C-alpha cells in the first residue's frame, strides 16, 4: 500500500486558523498477516505540496530554474530529471558537501535569490551531473505558514491511498476508498519557523564559510550550532582559556 506525496493531505483547525499538512515523499507500507497495512512514524509538514517543471534547453545559456513561490520549506524540496530521449527518471539529491563528487553525481544546490525565492542549481558535468538537453526537471516542495502551524495535534486525512493491482501484464495503482482507520498523532506539531531574517544571514554567512563546517574555535561553534538546531534563538560560545582558572582545549556553548 502506498501513500502518495502529491495530494497527501492532513487538515487541522487550530487557534491560528485552518492548516494543511503534507508529506514530501511517497510512503509505502507492507500489509501484515492480518491484511492491515500500518503507516508508522510518518513526519508530516505544515503547508501545501506543489510541483514545478522546467524544460532543459542547452541553447539558452542563461536558463535559470527559479521556484515561483515564497515561504518554501527547503528541507522538503525534491528534484527528479526525466530524460527526453529514453524517459528514464533520475532522482537528484541536495548537496551536503563536494567530497567525492564526480561528473555523474546527481546533486542539486538550493540558492536563495531576491524576493525570498529560491533557484535550483545543478552540476556542470565536472562537479556534479548536468541534466541533459531536452530533459524535464521536476521540483516538488511544500509552501509553509511558518510558526503559525505549531500546536496542531488532531488531524483528518484527506489524501490518496492506493495499492498495486495487476491488470493483464501491467501493474497499476488502484485507489483505496474504504477501510481507512483514524490517525494517531504522538505529539503536536512543532519547530515551524519563519524565514531567517536578513540580519542573521549577514552575520552567520561569512562565519559558516570561514569554519568550512569544522568546529574548532568558539566562533566556529557560534556559526555552526544554528545550522544543527535551526530553532534556537541565539548562541554564545567562548573558549576555556577565558575562564579563571583557564580550561585549555575546551569550548563552552
Which role does the model predict for each range below?
Residues 21, 118-122, 251-253:
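A generic structural motif
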Residues 76-123, 127-129:
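Extracellular/luminal ectodomains and secreted, surface-exposed scaffolds of diverse proteins
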Residues 10-11, 79, 137, 225:
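Buried hydrophobic packing residues in well-ordered domains
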Residues 12-26:
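Short beta-strand and beta-hairpin "edge-sheet" elements
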Residues 29-87, 119-120, 129-215, 248:
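Acidic, glycine-rich low-complexity/disordered segments
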Residues 1-10:
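Single conserved hydrophobic/aromatic residue that forms the stacking wall/gate
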Amino acid at each position: 500500500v502506498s501513500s502518495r506525496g502529491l495530494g497527501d493531505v492532513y487538515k487541522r483547525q487550530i487557534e491560528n486558523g485552518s492548516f494543511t499538512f503534507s508529506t514530501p515523499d511517497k510512503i509505502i507500507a507492507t500489509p501484515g498477516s492480518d491484511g492491515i497495512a500500518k503507516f508508522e512514524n510518518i513526519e508530516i509538514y505544515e503547508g501545501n505540496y506543489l510541483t514545478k517543471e522546467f524544460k532543459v534547453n542547452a541553447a539558452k545559456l542563461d536558463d535559470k530554474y527559479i521556484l515561483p513561490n515564497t515561504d518554501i520549506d527547503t528541507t522538503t524540496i525534491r528534484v527528479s530529471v526525466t530524460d527526453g530521449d529514453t524517459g528514464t527518471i533520475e532522482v537528484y539529491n541536495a548537496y551536503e558537501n563536494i567530497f567525492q563528487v564526480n561528473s555523474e553525481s546527481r546533486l542539486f544546490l538550493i540558492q536563495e535569490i531576491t524576493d525570498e525565492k529560491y533557484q535550483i542549481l545543478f552540476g556542470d558535468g565536472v562537479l556534479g551531473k548536468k541534466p541533459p538537453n531536452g530533459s524535464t526537471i521536476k521540483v516538488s516542495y511544500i509552501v509553509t505558514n511558518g510558526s503559525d502551524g505549531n500546536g496542531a495535534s488532531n488531524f483528518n486525512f484527506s489524501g490518496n491511498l492506493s495499492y498495486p493491482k495487476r491488470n493483464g501484464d501491467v501493474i497499476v495503482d488502484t485507489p483505496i476508498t474504504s477501510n481507512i482507520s483514524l490517525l494517531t498523532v504522538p505529539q503536536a506539531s512543532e519547530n515551524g519557523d519563519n524565514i531567517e531574517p536578513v540580519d542573521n544571514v549577514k552575520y552567520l554567512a561569512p562565519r559558516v564559510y570561514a569554519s568550512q563546517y569544522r568546529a574548532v574555535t568558539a566562533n566556529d561553534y557560534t556559526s555552526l550550532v544554528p545550522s544543527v538546531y535551526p530553532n534556537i534563538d541565539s548562541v554564545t560560545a567562548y573558549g576555556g582559556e577565558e575562564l579563571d582558572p583557564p580550561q585549555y582545549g575546551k569550548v563552552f556553548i
